[in-house]
Amino acid sequence: MKLIIVLVMMLVCVYSMSIEKNIPKNHEVPAKKQFAETKVEKKKRSDDGDEEICDDDDEDCEDVVDIEECNEDDDDCVDGGETEECDEDDDDCQEEKKKKKRETKPKLKKRNDDEEEEECEEDDEDCEVEVDIEECDEEDDDCYDEDKKKKKENKLKKESKKKNSKKTVPKNAKKSSKRSTSTKKTSQKKQQDKRGAIQKNLKIKEANFKKKFNLNF
């Protein structure tokens, strides 16, 4: 009887141990799994309508703010906001719109000035010196004068560049012709020296031959 009781106790112990192995404890759950569960809970909460608030220690969580970036050509668009449309009768709105347009233009100009300007070499005919030409309003007379001045400067620079390129071409041609004539002269002189040396050697050989055999011609 005691033996049966001991066997039953052993079976109960083994069964309880197997149950404990199959059921993991909370602290034994991997950290990634817990993090994934919290993310799912947060997503579910945001889907329900609640805004997601990030903890200070949570590096992966970010408060996302959608910022609309504007193109350079879109004058009506302002960075960080939607395009503002004004009514025709609303003068204040139109003035505000013009003010924003004036503020954005210097920013774009500064960005362009920060870029490196390409400098042309004297021999490079394809390269052209560019001058920035600002677009003028119809009512601004001073701007028109400045615009014409810049265009004139650009034209003069292009013409002077073309003249310089034309001058350099004949100079290079003269140099090449001088080089060719000098090379021809040197080659002719070398040939003459070579012939003279050959004739001299022949005369010396002939004199030695006569001395050897005491021949008189």
Swiss-Prot record:
Biased composition (Acidic residues): 48-58, 72-94, 114-145
Keyword entries, A-Z: Developmental protein, Repeat, Signal
Top-level taxon of the source organism: Eukaryota
Tissue specificity statement from the Swiss-Prot or TrEMBL entry: Expressed in tentacle-specific epithelial cells (battery cells) as well as in a small fraction of ectodermal epithelial cells in the gastric region subjacent to the tentacles (the tentacle formation region). The later cells are committed to become battery cells.
Sequence repeats, residue ranges: 32-81, 98-147
Coiled coil: none
Stretches for region 2 X 50 AA approximate repeats: 32-147
Induction line: By PKC.
Segments of this protein annotated with the region Disordered: 24-58, 72-205
Biased composition (Basic residues): 98-110, 149-188
Segments of skewed composition (Basic and acidic residues): 24-47
First and last residue of the signal peptide: 1-16
Record flagged with keyword Repeat: yes
Free-text function comment from the UniProt entry: Responds to early signals of head formation in hydra.
Annotated protein name in UniProt: KS1 protein
